[in-house]
């Protein structure tokens, strides 16, 4: 346990000099007692570089206000570690595993695991492919999620990534009753606060651990909070054999924080100003999220797409690790279609007959080809109008519009804003309903009846309310 002294403070980066034989290892946690008006505050640093001359460069996990040159720094001799196990359920933590929910503190005797760990070996990995039903039609039909897989929700600012994540937490907790870990990485504190109270009201919080490093926190906390959440999830997988859900909102902020830290550490930036270690950092996080022979971690990650540019290195690097992608499209939000999932751009490794069954696969591909044909005809419609289309094309367009509207639905978590009841639609019902639309069974029902509903029964009810004979 070495003692060092602060030699330099550059925002969230602090240099510390130790005695010759006491230089701490990379990733070790160091502590500084920072004097405050109401007593001393313990600031945690993480060693990032060994500069030579017995100096290490560290990243602060909290504000460095009040830190001065010459202050004493203690080496803890180990990584940052967080509490794990059932004590974490129903609680809210920061990056260091300290509770921030105004409830009683967690006992020091509770088991704590380090946040830096090796990914599971090849011989431990499970290769079974099983579908995770979400109750969201567009997801279950066209880009189904895999149990123990990695799922990305891609979209620009304000297209509904967080709302979709909240609905998934709600549906999976209510229908499947599994344990969830939510890591809020560099997002709005208000959203985290709302999510906590919503989950408390619905009772879901009892099976959820929450870890936050939000927008207002230093880059060190935002860069490490995803690892803190993952460590809690790994315990439930490895020690208790559970199938755990890990929600990360937002994985782009993990990369963004890494970029800020990289620049402060003096590394040469790579493409678009990102850190040169972007692929390595992402790989170290993503490879730990996997299914093993003991249990599984299914991760659902919101991915902010800067300026809606999917070729940006941050979303492009994330793409490489995912099994399913759900792409949110701004044009659909403008049309009032929620969730604004692009049915043609969203993909899933699980959409094949051997996994979902032949009927589901055929319906999904037919829905996509109908929507693709409609997209191709849109230019002709814009220039010449519907009258110039052949009867077959007119029928395709009308069915495609019904499909497009029927892919929308009301969410439970949005009830307070919309005043409409949310709906959970089982996969079997979804496949059967879309088969009927494709077969022309509901061509006589006006397309407005298909907007923001659950199953076909809701469409028929809505059509009756509109005065249509069904």
UniProtKB/Swiss-Prot annotation:
Its EC number is 7.1.2.2. Keywords: ATP synthesis, ATP-binding, Cell membrane, CF(1), Hydrogen ion transport, Ion transport, Membrane, Nucleotide-binding, Translocase, Transport. InterPro entries: AAA+_ATPase, ATP-synt_VA_C, ATP_synth_F1_bsu, ATPase_a/bsu_AS, ATPase_alpha/beta_chains, ATPase_F1/V1/A1_a/bsu_N, ATPase_F1/V1/A1_a/bsu_N_sf, ATPase_F1/V1/A1_a/bsu_nucl-bd. One of its GO terms (cellular component) is proton-transporting ATP synthase complex. Pfam families: ATP-synt_ab (PF00006), ATP-synt_ab_N (PF02874), ATP-synt_VA_C (PF22919). ATP binds at residues 155-162. It is found in: Cell membrane. The keyword Membrane applies. GO terms for molecular function: ATP binding; ATP hydrolysis activity; proton-transporting ATP synthase activity, rotational mechanism. Transmembrane segments: none annotated. It is a peripheral membrane protein. It is an enzyme of class 7 (translocase). It catalyses: ATP + H2O + 4 H(+)(in) = ADP + phosphate + 5 H(+)(out). Belongs to the ATPase alpha/beta chains family. Produces ATP from ADP in the presence of a proton gradient across the membrane. The catalytic sites are hosted primarily by the beta subunits. F-type ATPases have 2 components, CF(1) - the catalytic core - and CF(0) - the membrane proton channel. CF(1) has five subunits: alpha(3), beta(3), gamma(1), delta(1), epsilon(1). CF(0) has three main subunits: a(1), b(2) and c(9-12). The alpha and beta chains form an alternating ring which encloses part of the gamma chain. CF(1) is attached to CF(0) by a central stalk formed by the gamma and epsilon chains, while a peripheral stalk is formed by the delta and b chains. This is ATP synthase subunit beta. It comes from Staphylococcus epidermidis (strain ATCC 35984 / DSM 28319 / BCRC 17069 / CCUG 31568 / BM 3577 / RP62A).
